[in-house]
C-alpha cells in the first residue's frame, strides 16, 4: 500500500443491521467487491477506534466496522446477561451475514474486541463464514482461565475470588498507568460506552475464568502481542497454541492502544497476514525488528 486511498473509498457509509435482538450501527468503506475485513472494537470504545486503520486498509479491502451493543449508536440490551459473549458473537455473525452473505470474511479485534473474535472463531459457523482472524493483544477468556489453573499458580486461585475480590482486582487493573493512558478523545456516548463496557466484563470475566472450556478452531489466527502492553498475559501462550490449528504470532514493540498509537503497524500486520495466507498455508512465527 504505497498510495493514500481516495477519499470516496475511505469515507464510511452507515447502515443498520439487526443483531441478536437489537439494532447495530455498521459502517462500510473501501472497495465493494474486494475481500471483506470486519474490525471489532473493545469495551468503552466505539467503531471510531479503528478509523485510521480502516482508512488505510480501504484501498485494498472492503472494511467494515460497527458499534458493539451498548456502545456508540448501537442499541443496548436491558439486562447484563444480554452482554454474554455468545450474544456478542451472534451480533458479529449478523454483521457478517449482512455485509458478505456469500463469501467468508477476515476478522480483526482489539482488546475485548479480540475476545469477541475468539468467541466467534470457536463457533461452528466459523468453518464457512470466517477466512482468518487477527487478535490484537488478547487471548480468549478460556485460554486465560486455563492458564490460571496451572500448577505454576498454586496460590492464586483467581477463579475462586468472591465478588468483592473481583471488584478490588478490577479497580487495581484500571489504575495501571498503561490502561489509564487512553489516547483517544471522548465521544458524546462515552458515559453509556463506559457502562456497557462494565456490563460486558461483569457478564463474562468471572464466568469464563471460573469455567474455562477446551476449544479448537481451524480458522487461521494471527495473535499480535504488544511487548509493552500491561494487559498482555504471556502465560496463556501454550493454551492458545493448543486451541488453534494454524497460528501466526506477531510481537510488536508497542502499547495497548495499538490501533491509535501505531495504526500503520496494525495495517501492515493484517494485510501481510492475509497475503501470507494466500501464498502459503503453513503457520509461521515472526517478530518485528
Each language-model region and where it sits:
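N-terminal targeting or regulatory segments adjacent to alpha/beta-hydrolase or S9 domains
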Residues: 1-3, 288
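N-terminal cap/lid segment of alpha/beta-hydrolase-fold proteins
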Residues: 3-23
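Flexible "cap/lid" subdomain of the alpha/beta-hydrolase fold that forms the substrate-access gate
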Residues: 10-11, 22-24, 43-49, 64, ...
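Short, flexible hinge/linker loops that cap or flank conserved catalytic cores
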Residues: 18-20, 30-32, 215-217
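Conserved HGGG/HGGXW glycine-rich cap/lid loop of the alpha/beta-hydrolase fold
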Residues: 28-73
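Residue-level detector of flexible, active-site-proximal loop/helix-junction positions
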Residues: 33, 57, 140, 254-258
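Catalytic active-site module of serine/aspartate enzymes centered on a nucleophile-bearing elbow/loop
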Residues: 245-289
Amino acid at each position: 500500500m504505497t498510495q493514500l486511498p481516495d477519499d470516496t473509498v475511505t469515507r464510511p457509509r452507515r447502515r443498520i443491521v439487526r443483531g441478536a435482538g437489537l439494532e447495530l450501527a455498521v459502517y462500510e468503506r473501501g472497495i465493494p467487491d474486494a475481500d471483506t475485513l470486519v474490525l471489532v472494537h473493545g469495551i468503552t470504545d466505539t467503531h471510531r477506534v479503528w478509523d485510521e486503520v480502516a482508512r488505510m486498509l480501504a484501498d485494498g479491502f472492503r472494511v467494515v466496522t460497527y458499534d458493539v451493543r451498548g456502545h456508540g449508536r448501537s442499541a443496548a440490551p436491558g439486562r447484563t446477561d444480554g452482554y454474554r459473549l455468545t450474544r456478542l458473537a451472534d451480533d458479529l455473525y449478523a454483521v457478517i451475514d449482512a455485509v458478505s452473505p456469500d463469501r467468508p470474511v477476515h476478522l480483526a479485534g482489539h482488546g475485548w474486541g479480540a475476545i469477541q473474535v475468539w468467541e466467534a472463531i470457536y463457533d461452528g459457523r466459523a468453518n464457512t463464514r470466517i477466512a482468518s482472524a487477527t487478535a490484537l493483544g488478547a487471548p480468549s477468556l478460556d485460554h486465560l482461565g486455563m492458564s490460571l489453573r496451572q500448577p505454576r499458580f498454586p496460590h492464586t486461585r483467581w477463579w475462586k475470588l468472591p465478588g468483592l475480590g473481583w471488584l478490588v482486582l478490577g479497580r487495581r487493573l484500571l489504575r495501571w498507568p498503561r490502561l489509564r493512558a487512553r489516547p483517544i478523545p471522548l465521544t458524546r456516548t462515552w458515559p453509556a460506552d463506559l457502562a456497557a463496557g462494565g456490563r460486558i466484563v461483569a457478564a463474562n470475566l468471572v464466568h469464563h475464568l471460573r469455567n474455562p472450556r477446551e476449544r479448537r478452531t481451524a480458522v487461521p489466527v494471527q495473535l499480535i502481542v504488544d511487548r509493552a502492553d500491561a494487559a498482555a498475559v504471556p502465560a496463556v501462550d501454550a493454551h492458545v497454541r493448543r486451541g488453534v490449528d494454524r497460528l501466526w504470532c506477531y510481537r510488536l514493540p508497542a502499547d495497548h492502544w495499538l490501533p491509535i498509537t501505531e495504526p500503520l503497524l496494525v495495517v501492515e500486520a493484517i494485510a501481510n497476514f492475509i497475503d501470507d495466507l494466500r501464498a502459503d498455508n503453513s503457520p509461521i512465527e515472526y517478530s518485528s525488528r
